[in-house]
Amino acid sequence: MLLEAGGEDYNPLIHIPAGYIKTMVNPAMNWMFETEPEEGTGNRRIAIPRGKVLGGSSAINAMLYVRGQSADYDDWAQRGNRGWSYDDVLPYFRKAEHCEPLANGDDDFDDNLHGVGGPLNVAEVRTRYEALDRLIEAAETIGYPHNKDYNGATQDGF
């Protein structure tokens, strides 16, 4: 038995990556949770999108696959949660993935960090937009690194 609140995921906003932004403000698909005001955020409330649809939050994730920061896993292990260091969970990430590098080799996928043959297809965006390229160039100009694989060795950068 599967128990989930919300309706089925027939809404096209769920199945089109650009529709992601609309799911963030739609109470029919999002529980609309927010943090309490925090001093470190200028006393703002920060949205915590949680899916109110069959599939839960996975249905409103913009079709992105982003692993947690390795330091977070290592912190869990250091706090006594054996088996939860990044090195411990990495084999499971690899087993779950079917990573598709770009045909032209213009990516930074490290075979030691990614898997092939798993049920979760992970691929670089195939369609490039000039505006995105300009954003990345601007970020590099002011010192941010360009990161072609944010599930790789580091998640820092654009």
Per-region residue spans from a language model:
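N-terminal redox-cofactor-binding region of secreted/periplasmic oxidoreductases
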Residues: M1-F158
